[in-house]
Amino acid sequence: MTKKMGVNAALNLFKTALSIIFPLITYPYISRILGVENLGKINYTASIVGYFSLIAALGISTYAIREGGRIRSNSEKLSHLGNQIFTINILSTVVSYLLLLLVVWLFIPNREYQILICIQSLTIVFATLGVDWINVLFEDFLYITIRSIIIQILSLILMFVLVKTANDLYLYTFISVIGSGISCILNLIYCRKYLKLSLVWKLDLAKHFKPIMVLFSGGLVISIYANSDMLILEWFKGAYYVGLYAVAARVYTILKNLLASIYSVTIPRLSHLFGEQKIDEFKKSYTQILSVVTLILIPMSAGLIVLSREIILFLGGIKFIDATLTLQLLAISLIGAIFGGILTYGLNIPIGRESVNLTGALYGIIVNIGISLLLIPVFKQNGAAVATIASEFFIVLYNFLVVRESGKYIDFVIWRKNLIQALLGFFSIIIIGFGVKLFVTNSLLLIFSITLVGIIVYLLELKLLKNPLLDHILDMVKHKFRRG
């Protein structure tokens, strides 16, 4: 991993970490003010809007980052590509809104749901006009991080000041999306330093259509199986159980996004290396990224299993206690989700294998919906969690079986050593966690003590095992202090 990639990963990790801290501050308050059912309504309508956000996005962001990464040194070609992509994105956004209006008119008579969808759908146009893919393409993660901090602080203040009762459902929803609007305005101004976008009448659809549609189809299918459990749960059991599932899914999603932030920033650089056929350098960088994620992911899932009850009580209170097992199941799913993500997004996208992602996601949704229909009527929110586990691990298995030349891009000898050390950390944290619970009963103290002791013991294990990645990080820190 190059120094630039390391800095970008650190910045993106920090930005995503803030997305954990801020919900930890706001969610306990919001869940108690709005209640289980209102949170279920918000999550249900958000899942509907999510599908139309995908139609508007059309896989364009990923396509722009990959293709732009290969030609970003040529300003003329990049400007042409940017204008083409921006115009296509505007057209897809218009189509998305027309389809959303039609669906709401025909299938969603509930007035409350209609208003929530109307508010949440603002994020669609904000995302299109925000053109955040330009910042990622030019690896300007410092700006992205600073912008994110400012917007999240503003949203936090507005929530605590304005949301006071369960009747503030619409106000809370509006505050949740207004950050996207502010981000959009800031980006429209800031991104002009890189690209001055404009609409064009002549589109080269023959060139862009197929790869964009493959990426869009893959994203749509992934979104369907990501949201299908929530939709099926609402259909069979109602908003209450969606609310229970939502609090566990929120923790799961936050941690998934945190880990994904490590590898998502590498797409422009890996695309550049692959475009120049620097395969050895590609293999070294990708293996390091995979190893770093593995060393963090496996022990993190163990900590989540141990602390699920305490986390649920902290976030939602005793009303959400039935979501404990749900979160423990999703902690297992987290492993499959991240390995699947680093294979599909971190490897297949840079090497142009997005068609594999699409096929794998199609099979994944069949697995997810099939198991959801079978288990949700009986096991409610826990059945939805099991369906998520099955689909996530299926996608990992499918990718390993289909991308047969993965050994060309991954050094499995190095990765296996890190995997074994991560598994050792997994069992250590499980033992430590349940051991500490014998002596400590306070939920917040449990979260703090198990997290602190678990991290210290795990780092000591890695040091004793002479893990090269940890040694490299420690050497960098020592060198930094000596220079300072």
What is each of the regions a protein language model found here?
Residues M1-F22, E76-S79, N83, K202-G218, ...:
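N-terminal membrane topogenesis motif
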Residues A17, A56-A57, T62, N83-R111, ...:
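Alpha-helical transmembrane segments of multi-pass membrane transport and lipid-handling proteins
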Residues I21-L39, V161-T165, S223-I254, P268-L273, ...:
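Helix-terminus/linker motif at the lipid-water interface of multi-pass membrane proteins
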Residues K15, S19-P23, Y27, T45-S53, ...:
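Short runs within selected transmembrane alpha-helices of multi-pass transporters and secretion channels
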Residues Y27-S53, L169, K207-L215, L233-T253, ...:
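Interfacial/gating helices of multi-pass transporter permease domains
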